[in-house]
């Protein structure tokens, strides 16, 4: 057996463009030798080796790194629905970007439901897994919610384990995603003067851009869902019509 990965290195002096993204590359190398390491252990090592021993730096950067993945998931495509990106860059939001070409059929959104049925009652994709995974993914009530819309077509009024409807979950997570980026930005700004100035400014610029981009994703996704379903956000937050 072996390991392989897709790594976004480039011509930047720090290789990864975003200084904090180097933690992923470090983690890949560490897992190649010790496969049982936890994300927290890897992150703690990388922070200490890269940014030093300052307790506030270690605490804040650890929080940022542990938040980054779930935060991105919150404000982009919900519950494993698939690509909702612009075809020209795979980065900006575009709900129907790939929906109507030969690579499409990711979300099949209607006024009442969303998702592609890949269960045994649909395309049968779930049956490519060995048991017990095949049965687990095949049923809505046992499929992990983080994978729900990849394997199933689900009504917007379906109630999740949180007690939210599916549609309200989409609204909530996209607002929460922006709030999480704001929190990460504040955590980094608290480190001014505690890390190398050039590193601080590069990461600050990236995080400010991420906040702008998260707001764009939030507004595009929530507006699309609202227009299709005509169901308002229960909390009355701003959704553009």
Please give the residue ranges for each predicted region:
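Catalytic domains of carbohydrate-active enzymes that cleave complex glycans
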Residues: 1-241
């Amino acid at each position: 057996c072996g390991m392989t990965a897709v790594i976004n290195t480039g011509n930047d002096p720090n290789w990864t463009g975003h200084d904090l993204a180097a933690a992923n590359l470090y983690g890949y190398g560490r897992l190649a030798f010790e496969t049982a390491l936890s994300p927290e252990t890897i992150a703690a090592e990388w922070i200490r080796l890269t940014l030093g021993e300052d307790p506030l730096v270690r605490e804040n950067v650890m929080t940022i790194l542990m938040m980054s993945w779930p935060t991105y998931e919150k404000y982009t495509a919900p519950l494993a629905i698939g690509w909702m990106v612009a075809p020209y860059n795979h980065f900006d939001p575009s709900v129907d970007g790939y929906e109507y070409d030969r690579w499409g059929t990711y979300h099949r959104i209607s006024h009442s439901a969303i998702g592609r049925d890949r269960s045994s009652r649909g395309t049968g994709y779930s049956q490519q897994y060995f048991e017990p995974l095949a049965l687990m993914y095949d049923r809505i009530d046992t499929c992990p919610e983080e994978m729900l819309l990849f394997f199933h077509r689900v009504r917007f009024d379906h109630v999740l384990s949180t007690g939210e409807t599916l549609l309200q979950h989409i609204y909530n997570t996209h607002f929460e995603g922006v709030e999480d980026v704001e929190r990460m930005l504040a955590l980094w700004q608290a480190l001014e003067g505690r890390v190398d100035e050039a590193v601080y400014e590069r990461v600050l610029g990236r995080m400010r851009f991420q906040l702008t981009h998260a707001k764009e994703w939030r507004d595009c996704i929530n507006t699309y869902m609202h227009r299709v379903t005509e169901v308002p956000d229960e909390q009355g937050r701003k959704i553009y019509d």
